[in-house]
Every structure is written in structure tokens, then in C-alpha cells.
Curated annotation (Swiss-Prot):
Disruption outcome: Viable, with severe reduction of sperm production in males.
Protein name: High mobility group protein B2
Biological process (GO), any one: spermatogenesis
Biased amino acid composition, Acidic residues: 187-210
Post-translational modification: Reduction/oxidation of cysteine residues Cys-23, Cys-45 and Cys-106 and a possible intramolecular disulfide bond involving Cys-23 and Cys-45 give rise to different redox forms with specific functional activities in various cellular compartments: 1- fully reduced HMGB2 (HMGB2C23hC45hC106h), 2- disulfide HMGB2 (HMGB2C23-C45C106h) and 3- sulfonyl HMGB2 (HMGB2C23soC45soC106so).
Family classification: Belongs to the HMGB family.
Secreted is among the record's keywords: yes
Region listing for Disordered, in residue ranges: 71-102, 162-210
Disulfide pairings: 23-45
Keyword Transcription: yes
Keywords: Acetylation, Chemotaxis, Chromosome, Cytoplasm, Disulfide bond, DNA recombination, DNA-binding, Immunity, Inflammatory response, Innate immunity, Nucleus, Oxidation, Phosphoprotein, Repeat, Secreted, Transcription, Transcription regulation
Organism name: Mus musculus (Mouse)
Region (Required for chemotactic activity): 165-180
Length: 210
């Protein structure tokens, strides 16, 4: 999918997200020219939040309640656009295409970015993640690449078993097309099926990111 619906209400923020936003504003006022070390900043915010009293947290909880009320009110009046993607139905039992190393990295780091930049758009979040990934050293990327390789290996085994099962079931149902052309066309059909699966899964991954 491309960009999400611009008319969709902005998501509600938690009390902690409001607290982090306040911390960022304070930091910008004190150090307008310095850049923020994301990992250190997140750690300091988390530690500070844990030591705060219930009374200190209450103002952020009030902000979160107000924002939730705003979100619920806007969602009642929100009408999602009609005629969204209507593809063919996918077999829910089909193995899901494995994520890439970059996708695993994004899944891990996206929540942190949302906390630090609560108002950031989907496109800007993706851009930020891309920049963070490119700054990672080969050593830092290695755990994600190893995990992705294992998931890919498992997927290849699962999809082979799934297709073998599908063929045996199709055989039981009887001839669905002229037998003379079956062997010749099978490899091409498999490639077409795989391409369709990949395209649909790519779209699903983009939806998940939204």
C-alpha cells in the first residue's frame, strides 16, 4: 500500500509518550544545537519515569485520557475509504513469507521511534529507520541477517511441504486440465504462484508497518 488515509484520526498517545515528548522539548530548550543520542535519551527517560511519584505522573495520565477521548470521538465520525484493495483470498494455511534482516530491524526499532517522535508520519518513520539501518556496522547487522537466514530456510522447507500437499490433494480431486500439458506447465505455474505470493506478502508487510 502507499500512504495511509490522511483523514484517519491520529493515534492516541500513552502517558509515557507524553512524558517523553516533554523531555524532548526540555532537552531542545537546554541544548538547541546538540543532536540527541537516541539510545541514551530513551534509557534516561525510562529511568526517570520509574522514579517519578504517582502525583508527578498524574498530569501525563490526564493528558493521555484527554487524548484517548479525542481519538474515540474522532473515530466515531471517521468513515474509512471504500474500494480498498480487494485481492484474491489467500489460503490462511499457506506459510507466510519470511521477513528480511531490515524488516526485523524495523520491527524492533519502530516502537522506539514512535515514542521519541510521536507525531512522525509513516513515511518519515520509514525514512528514519532506513537511515538508522545504513548507519549500522556489519557486526551490528549480523544478528538480524542470521535470524532472517534461519527464517528463510524454514520458510523454504514449509512452502515445499505445503506445495507437495497441495499437489497431492489436487490429484485426488481428478484431472483439472489436459494431462498432456501438465508436466510442461508445472514449473511455470509454480513460478507464477510464487510471484503472486511474494507480491501479496509485500503488500501485507507494508500494511503491517502502517
Amino acid at each position: 500500500m502507499g500512504k495511509g488515509d490522511p483523514n484517519k484520526p491520529r493515534g492516541k498517545m500513552s502517558s509515557y509518550a507524553f512524558f517523553v515528548q516533554t523531555c524532548r522539548e526540555e532537552h531542545k530548550k537546554k541544548h538547541p544545537d546538540s543532536s540527541v543520542n537516541f539510545a541514551e535519551f530513551s534509557k534516561k527517560c525510562s529511568e526517570r519515569w520509574k522514579t517519578m511519584s504517582a502525583k508527578e505522573k498524574s498530569k501525563f495520565e490526564d493528558l493521555a485520557k484527554s487524548d484517548k477521548a479525542r481519538y474515540d470521538r474522532e473515530m466515531k465520525n471517521y468513515v474509512p475509504p471504500k474500494g480498498d484493495k480487494k485481492g484474491k483470498k489467500k489460503d490462511p494455511n499457506a506459510p507466510k513469507r519470511p521477513p528480511s534482516a531490515f524488516f526485523l530491524f524495523c520491527s524492533e526499532n519502530r516502537p522506539k521511534i514512535k515514542i521519541e517522535h510521536p507525531g512522525l508520519s509513516i513515511g518519515d518513520t520509514a525514512k528514519k529507520l532506513g537511515e538508522m539501518w545504513s548507519e549500522q556496522s556489519a557486526k551490528d547487522k549480523q544478528p538480524y541477517e542470521q535470524k532472517a537466514a534461519k527464517l528463510k530456510e524454514k520458510y523454504e522447507k514449509d512452502i515445499a511441504a505445503y506445495r507437495a500437499k497441495g499437489k497431492s490433494e489436487a490429484g485426488k480431486k481428478g484431472p483439472g486440465r489436459p494431462t498432456g500439458s501438465k508436466k510442461k506447465n508445472e514449473p511455470e505455474d509454480e513460478e507464477e504462484e510464487e510471484e503472486e505470493e511474494e507480491e501479496e506478502d509485500d503488500e501485507e508487510e507494508e500494511e503491517d508497518e502502517e
